[in-house]
């Protein structure tokens, strides 16, 4: 009784009118809309302007809108493509997802996801959506990027709503631009939803502001993933300049080259360095060292990917700004 009362207080009574309207159209939709597109039709109808009209008491307008949607669906070609949602899944904590990301995750027919997607984020995808894992660990891609691009096109051409779920933000070292370039060339509809990039999420959870008036007037995001020959080919003189913060994505594997490049171009050996491991997730760890000693830290510490390097004076602020560590101490005390 308590649960029923709670639900009745949360669900507007007008939803009954919306349900009756859907029932009136059910058999017509079954005849006019192919089965592969039927769920998408109802979701578009019942989450958009039709629902808004009915819930606002404009039942006649809602019925007219649904008639128009059904008419358009009946004239759509059978081979019309579906749509691809390129969604940033953030750094790992599912509570950092955007509202739009969560909505599209619940609408998708199939999800294509990478290694960097946490279990907590993946659990929020529609339960009956097909799941396709494409890997993309360092040097161990379950599918090469070109095959991932082709997979997205193939799934969308089958009329499916494809969730391309990527860790962090798809446009920051996520190769999202390459994927939508292919979709554009193939005439596949798509939309892009940004996510919180690892630099922002990891730094915030570690208590390290990326900029600070006393320490850094700029921040630079850098890929730490070396080329096949082991060379990073970066602008080391610019990166070694003072009063800035450097964030290296995928930097642990190339830590020796990063250390050498910065030291060789004048960065002080005592420059603070933080390695944030599995940032924003329950098993997150933060290791603090200096540029001179960071390689030794990596050698003696088993660091699990994903891990992020933060280099600069802002790292010294962690001692007093580690809000999560302080909260844990208060709870323990």
Annotate each PLM feature.
Residues 1-20, 197-201, 207, 306-307:
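Short alpha-helices
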Residues 1-9, 24-27, 31, 94, ...:
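Adenine nucleotide-associated cytosolic modules
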Residues 4-7, 99-107, 125-130, 178-182, ...:
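Short, solvent-exposed amphipathic alpha-helical segments in soluble enzyme
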Residues 20-78, 82-84, 158-162, 216-218, ...:
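A contiguous loop/helix-start segment that scaffolds small-molecule binding in enzyme catalytic cores
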Residues 72-73, 80-88, 106-196, 201, ...:
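Class I S-adenosyl-L-methionine
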Residues 86-96, 139, 226-227:
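Short, glycine-rich nucleotide/cofactor-binding loops
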Residues 129-136, 187-191, 210-220, 266-275:
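Short hydrophobic/aromatic-enriched beta-strand-loop microsegments
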Residues 169-242, 282-289:
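Class I SAM-dependent methyltransferase SAM-binding "motif I" and its flanking Rossmann-like core
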């Amino acid at each position: 009784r308590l649960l029923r009362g709670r639900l009745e207080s949360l669900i507007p009574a007008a939803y009954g009118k919306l349900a009756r309207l859907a029932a009136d159209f059910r058999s017509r939709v079954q005849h006019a809309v192919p089965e592969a597109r039927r769920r998408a039709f109802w979701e578009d109808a019942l989450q958009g302007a039709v629902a808004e009209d009915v819930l606002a008491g404009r039942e006649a307008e809602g019925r007219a809108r649904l008639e128009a949607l059904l008419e358009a669906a009946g004239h759509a070609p059978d081979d019309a493509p579906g749509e691809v949602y390129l969604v940033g899944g953030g750094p790992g904590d599912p509570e950092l997802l955007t509202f739009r990301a969560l909505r599209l995750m619940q609408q998708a027919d199939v999800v294509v996801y990478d290694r960097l997607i946490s279990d907590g984020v993946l659990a929020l995808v529609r339960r009956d959506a097909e799941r396709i894992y494409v890997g993309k660990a360092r040097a161990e891609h379950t599918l090469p990027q070109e095959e991932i691009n082709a997979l997205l096109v193939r799934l969308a051409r089958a009329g499916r709503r494809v969730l391309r779920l990527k860790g962090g933000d798809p446009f920051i070292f996520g190769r999202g631009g390459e994927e939508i370039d292919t979709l554009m060339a193939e005439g596949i509809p798509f939309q892009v939803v940004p996510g919180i990039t690892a630099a922002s999420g990891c730094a915030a959870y570690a208590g390290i502001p990326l900029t600070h008036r006393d320490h850094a007037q700029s921040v630079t995001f850098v890929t730490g993933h070396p080329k096949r020959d082991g060379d990073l080919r970066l602008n080391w003189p610019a990166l070694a300049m003072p009063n800035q913060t450097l964030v290296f994505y995928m930097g642990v594997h190339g830590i020796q080259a990063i250390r050498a490049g910065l030291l060789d171009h004048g960065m002080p050996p005592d420059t603070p360095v933080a390695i944030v491991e599995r940032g924003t997730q329950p098993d997150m760890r933060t290791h603090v060292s200096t540029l001179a000693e960071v390689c030794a830290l990596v050698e003696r510490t088993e660091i699990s990917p994903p891990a992020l390097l933060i280099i600069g004076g802002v790292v010294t602020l962690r001692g007093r700004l580690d809000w999560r560590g302080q909260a844990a101490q208060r709870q323990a005390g």
